[in-house]
């Protein structure tokens, strides 16, 4: 049996894939993928030499980014705010993904069985699966949540507790259970992705991740919503 791919000590280029459903995907849900890009050689190598010491620069990872839909290469997938993105791969020609990110689709869209089958296939092969905001709905429909601990948009938690009672649903900005990472609504995906990156590629003084968090002003917020007074 093949050993799981070690994202923290990769021996090849990491494949980061955003899986897009056929409806409209929330742009802010999938935007956090760019946080991963900010610690790659492709990004770091373009920074001015005086900005980044060589010992930190050398920590950058090699990664390629794949945008995957059922229709595939050269087709466009819709995002919110009248945006669209040209996908790079179809379900048929996409290589196994190491990191998967899925955001919410519009409420009126129902994922196809082919879409859900590809999500399940990607779940089996990946080392990390990030369901951002309503992307948890795709994970639920694909049957990969099971009895895991997960979070979701706060307004959806009670409904999910009723629909998927075998799972443990927590009221948090983000949650991790093994390779499944889930987040609250929209911008909580930034918190989830930040936590994933810190856990996977290191943190603390002298690390590229710590430097990038400061350079790019990544949010640092209470994971249990302790910094806000409102609730659902």
Set out the residue ranges of the language-model regions.
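Extended, subdomain-level signal for the structured scaffold at the beginning of enzyme domains
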Residues: 1-129, 137-141, 158, 163, ...
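Aromatic-residue-lined binding/catalytic grooves and analogous aromatic/hydrophobic interfacial grooves
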Residues: 133
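Rossmann-fold dinucleotide-binding core
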Residues: 145-154, 159-183
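A short beta-strand/loop micro-motif in the catalytic core of glycosyltransferases
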Residues: 129-130, 150
């Amino acid at each position: 049996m093949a050993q799981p791919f070690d994202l923290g000590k990769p021996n090849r280029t990491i494949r980061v894939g955003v899986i897009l459903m056929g409806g409209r995907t929330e742009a802010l849900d999938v935007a956090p993928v760019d946080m991963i890009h900010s610690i790659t050689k492709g990004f770091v190598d373009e920074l001015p030499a005086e900005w980044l010491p060589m010992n930190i620069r050398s920590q950058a990872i090699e990664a390629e980014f794949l945008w995957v839909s059922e229709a595939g290469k050269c087709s466009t997938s819709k995002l919110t705010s009248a945006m669209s993105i040209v996908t790079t791969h179809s379900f048929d020609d996409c290589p196994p993904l190491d990191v998967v990110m899925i955001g919410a689709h519009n409420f009126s869209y129902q994922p196809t069985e082919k879409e859900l089958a590809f999500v399940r296939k990607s779940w089996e092969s990946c080392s990390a699966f990030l369901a951002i905001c309503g992307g948890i709905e795709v994970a639920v429909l694909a049957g990969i949540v099971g009895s895991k601990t997960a979070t979701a948009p706060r307004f959806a938690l009670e409904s999910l507790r009723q629909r998927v009672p075998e799972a443990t649903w927590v009221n948090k900005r983000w949650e991790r259970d093994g390779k499944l990472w889930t987040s609250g609504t929209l911008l909580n995906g930034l918190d989830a992705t930040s936590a994933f990156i810190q856990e996977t590629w290191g943190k603390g003084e002298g690390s590229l991740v710590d430097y990038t968090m400061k350079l790019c002003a990544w949010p640092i917020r209470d994971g249990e919503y302790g910094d806000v007074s409102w609730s659902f």
